[in-house]
Amino acid sequence: MRRWAWAAVVVLLGPQLVLLGGVGARREAQRTQQPGQRADPPNATASASSREGLPEAPKPSQASGPEFSDAHMTWLNFVRRPDDGALRKRCGSRDKKPRDLFGPPGPPGAEVTAETLLHEFQELLKEATERRFSGLLDPLLPQGAGLRLVGEAFHCRLQGPRRVDKRTLVELHGFQAPAAQGAFLRGSGLSLASGRFTAPVSGIFQFSASLHVDHSELQGKARLRARDVVCVLICIESLCQRHTCLEAVSGLESNSRVFTLQVQGLLQLQAGQYASVFVDNGSGAVLTIQAGSSFSGLLLGT
């Protein structure tokens, strides 16, 4: 009977005794540990290796999935790669590049000075002026024409000789348009019979006259005087003294029987005004203007 009682006690108190034994063994292990030491946490090794720069690869949990495992292993392989001196040298040389330069990548461009900027500005101003001037002329030019159209121009010759008495002023008339190639008569401003060119519009005109003067009557006579001269004039409205005129003066001391007297220049005419050629004989003998003497004019612009 007593045996059965002890057996029942052992069955009931056995688990409690085993638990008390485990607790006692743990306390004994803590007593035997040195005072300066402390137990490392389970992840102490991983933390130390991460502080050294080479983290250990913890085992990925099974619930992370294959994608997370592959990415994690790739990162660890990159961190644990061998020390490549060439790669480090290349990266180091890249860091040594100057960082104080602004602008797009590449070698620096040429230095731009104030003189260069001024020259470029002058070129731009010149181009703008040419474009503006071309735009002003476009309405006056026919489509597709690259040259300026001359609206009024003429070249005519004296049809016959013209006698000029001494001390007289004579207006030349009786011109004709030459039939030879090269002569021209453009516009309707010239009257060949009267020898007058009437301006169709107000503008600046260029005129010229080339007269062949015959002074054969003076040869063999008394010595020429200082006032024995001949003048060729191109006058406006036949008023040579009131308006501006083109004038050429020549003496009569030439040894030849005939000499040529020329005059040319620019005159501004208003619409309706005319210009013509005059000969002023200041000598004491009769002069003759030979046939073939020419008179020409051209409208330069308005």
Curated annotation (Swiss-Prot):
Belongs to the adipolin/erythroferrone family. Homomultimer; disulfide-linked. May interact with ERFE. Induction: By insulin in subcutaneous adipose tissue. Keywords: Disulfide bond, Glycoprotein, Hormone, Secreted, Signal. Insulin-sensitizing adipocyte-secreted protein (adipokine) that regulates glucose metabolism in liver and adipose tissue. Promotes glucose uptake in adipocytes and suppresses de novo glucose production in hepatocytes via the PI3K-Akt signaling pathway. Administration lead to reduction of blood glucose. Able to attenuate inflammation in fat tissue. Residues 1-20 form the signal peptide. The gene is C1QTNF12. Predominantly expressed by adipose tissues. Processed into Adipolin fC1QTNF12 and Adipolin gC1QTNF12 by FURIN. Insulin enhances endogenous C1QTNF12 cleavage. Residues 28-68, 86-110 are annotated as: Disordered. Residues 147-302 form the C1q domain. PANTHER family: ADIPOLIN. GO terms for biological process: D-glucose import; establishment of localization in cell; gluconeogenesis; negative regulation of gluconeogenesis; negative regulation of inflammatory response; phosphatidylinositol 3-kinase/protein kinase B signal transduction; positive regulation of D-glucose import; positive regulation of insulin receptor signaling pathway. This is Adipolin. PROSITE patterns: C1Q (PS50871). The record marks 97-98 as: Cleavage. GO terms for molecular function: hormone activity. One of its GO terms (cellular component) is extracellular region. Glycans are attached at residue 43. Residues 86-100 have a biased composition (Basic and acidic residues).
